[in-house]
Amino acid sequence: LDYYWDDVPSDKQKEIFQQQVDLAKKHQKPIIIHTIEQFLISTNIDEIVVAVPQNWISYTEDIINRYCKDKKIHVIQGGATRNETIMNVCNYIQNISPNEENIVVTHDAVRPFITQRIIKENIEMCKEYGAADTVIPATDTIVHAKYGQFISDIPVRSEMYQGQTPQTFKVNEFINVYNSLSEGEKTILTDATKVYVMREKKVALVEGESYNIKITTKYDLKMANL
């Protein structure tokens, strides 16, 4: 699980973190706890690694110990980006449990409505194809505007999907593929699965759920009714 999103500015991430604090003060479970609980009950998950910014580690450990303390939960420092964070997690996993067959199921800490089906199917697809991404079909027409002013293209909607998480990878393969990228290639990454796409590797699709939302605003929190 991670608190890093390449598409969420740092000031918004601070606001999201403050939501966790405010919920705890109201004696309500922080969003991340709801998320962790879904992975704790999964029979397919051996260890849970929560990656957060350095200055969030102490608080994250405190709320985990308060609500769902478990020896399989580990809190570590993430990286400067989503993909660097995944690399930190992958390296941590290989240090505590070296295994060529290790799989990492990466998930946004603020997507608490993850289902057991989605977790299970991510792992199954990853075992078969090497990587998996959770998506839902696009319901609106997608417009491509290369320079943000005029329409460049309108893709066929039936071929378009909206990305969610989890995104799931074989640990060693992710490390190898990511390390094969140049620094220039790494700077343009906006999504973990693009690491694979850039190296023309298959990423299998897993059907998500419309309610598997990322809670990043007060409106999202109200709609989630947590």
Where are the regions that the model predicts?
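Divalent metal-binding pocket/active-site signature
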Residues: L1-I33
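Residue-level signal for inorganic ion chemistry
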Residues: A24, I32, V89, D108, ...
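Conserved N-terminal catalytic core of the sugar/cofactor nucleotidyltransferase
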Residues: I32-E101, L181-G184
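Structural beta-sheet core signal
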Residues: V49-V50, T106, A131-T134
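Hydrophobic packing residues within well-ordered alpha-helices of enzyme cores
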Residues: T60-I64, N122, A224
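Short beta-strand-to-loop acidic/aromatic patch adjacent to the donor-nucleotide binding site
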Residues: P98-V110
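Conserved core of the sugar-phosphate nucleotidyltransferase
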Residues: E100, F113-V206
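Hydrophobic helical membrane-anchoring modules
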Residues: N212-L226
